[in-house]
């Protein structure tokens, strides 16, 4: 599956999770979008998605997701500054 199609599916998953107030799904979708956008070199947008994932994980008490989002946020932010 190509990256654009995958991004479309993840964005739809985010919409559905939001409509259903499924916070764990929202944070997971933001993480996936961040990873996809990092791979495309869109570090500015990916850091925003990682930040959203981190905040939602913090709200829901999901420590593992919060830590993963922090790491990805830091890596994308560093990559953005290097380019």
Where are the predicted features?
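Alpha-helical solenoid scaffolds in eukaryotic proteins
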Residues: 11-12, 52
């Amino acid at each position: 599956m190509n990256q654009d199609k995958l991004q479309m599916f993840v964005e739809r998953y985010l919409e559905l999770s939001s409509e259903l107030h499924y916070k764990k799904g929202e944070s997971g979708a933001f993480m996936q979008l961040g990873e996809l956008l990092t791979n495309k070199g869109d570090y500015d947008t990916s850091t925003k998605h990682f930040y959203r994932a981190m905040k939602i994980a913090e709200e829901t008490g999901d420590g593992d997701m919060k830590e993963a989002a922090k790491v990805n946020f830091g890596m994308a932010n560093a990559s953005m500054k290097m380019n």
